[in-house]
Amino acid sequence: MIESILILSKTGIIRFIKIYSSNDENLNKSELVNNILINIQKSEDTQIIYDFPYINNEKRKLVYKSFGGIYLILIIDECENELASLDFINVIMKVLDEIFKGVCEIHMIMNPDKLYFLIDEMICGGMVIETNKEDIIKNYNDKMKFDDVNYKYFSK
């Protein structure tokens, strides 16, 4: 199960965070981000960190990938496959890249609603439900058309 998904700038600023674990009331986000950045800096050669201390020092796996000025990070439990998680990170970035025509940090800042919609199309309750890029983009485009029609109708 995916416990959390984060998008951080290289300087450690949270651009997106979604937590799927049920005991997140004990989560200190700034401490989590500091812990993530320290572990990423220590592990320059790998994109998978085992025994990552998560909520209440429970051990999880941290899988991340760097894209330009951002880190896309998944915190997963022991049952989740690390290589599948890395592949899923690539799917997320391909979808974001197609939607935003070359995704960068400013897109995360200016379009959080679109970002949450796209992530929710792919993950539900910590489980990956969709990895087909074309289906995700089609659903996104359908939603944008629907929102545009509603805006035109209700703004009269």
Which residues does each predicted region cover?
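Acidic, low-complexity cytosolic segments
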Residues: 1-156
